[in-house]
A protein has these predicted regions:
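Conserved N-lobe ATP-binding subsite of Hanks-type protein kinase domains
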Residues: 30
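Conserved short submotifs of the Hanks-type protein kinase catalytic core
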Residues: 88-101, 105
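Conserved N-lobe beta3->alphaC-helix segment of eukaryotic protein kinase catalytic domains
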Residues: 42, 47-72
């Protein structure tokens, strides 16, 4: 198990990652931006507080999300790099999508041009088709769960409600 280290200046480090500002909040904790202490690479860190994962359904949900994130490898699906565990939390170290939510992108622009919307749709279809080939159903696709990278490419995130299935 890793340790949480709080420096004199107030910065928190877990494993090889320095925790930064909050990016969002979820059922079991929050998502923060992080920086790898050796490489300087920016990452998203989903902090899951173990004391909020109370019943069997919660444990199953978190385990299923982690299992799914471990097997998916597609340019449109956010990548899980590693998991750091402490006594009180699980830290899911993931790919950081700097562009934020597709929802905010659309709201800020008030509209999306047809060519750009088609690009988003094709990327989304590519990601969903890949997930379905693996027998994974996301079950919570919405603009808030579609993030964007530096080049405005879609990244599917938040597999908390996802499940696996066998065709037939």
């Amino acid at each position: 198990m890793a340790e949480v280290i709080v420096a004199a200046d107030g910065t928190t480090t877990v494993g090889h990652y320095k925790l930064g500002r909050d990016l969002g909040k979820g059922t079991f904790g929050k998502v923060k931006v992080g920086t790898h202490t050796l490489t300087g690479e920016k990452v998203a860190i989903k902090v899951l507080e173990k004391d909020k994962i109370i019943d069997v359904n919660d444990v199953d949900r978190v385990a299923r999300e982690i299992k799914i994130l471990k097997i998916v490898r597609h340019p449109v699906v956010v990548q899980l790099y590693e998991i750091v565990e402490t006594q009180k939390e699980l830290y899911l170290i993931m790919e950081y999508a700097r562009g934020g939510e597709l929802f905010e992108y659309i709201v800020n622009r008030k509209r999306v041009r047809e060519k750009e919307a088609a690009k988003f749709l094709l990327q989304l279809i590519s990601g969903i088709e890949y997930l379905h080939r693996l027998g994974i159903c996301h079950r919570d696709l919405k603009p808030e769960n579609l993030l964007m990278d530096d080049y405005n490419n879609i990244k599917i995130v938040d597999f908390g409600l996802s499940n696996t299935y066998r065709p037939g």
